[in-house]
Amino acid sequence: VSTVNLSEAQSKLVRTGFPPDDAWESALTFCNEIISFDSSQARLAGGMIATTQPLGLSLGDRACLALAMLLKAPVYTTDRLWKKLSFDLEIRLLR
């Protein structure tokens, strides 16, 4: 998981009332590997804005997609809109 997405997960938990440190520890429980957001990911994520903005995707969403592209890994999401993307990625819906 990208450090950007880990931060997003922590933020969502804090918004629901978790103390920040507890939210961080809870978010970590779902991570097998944490990958720092770097310039390669930033370049890909930034270049996706025209395609992803009409679907309402966030920087965190684009960071996730960029990391998957670089790793040639599938992306798991609950957001059905991602299936409309025309990137060379395997997008798997969780529900």
Predicted regions, residues:
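PIN-domain endoribonuclease scaffold, especially VapC-family toxins
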Residues: 1-55, 63-73, 85-88
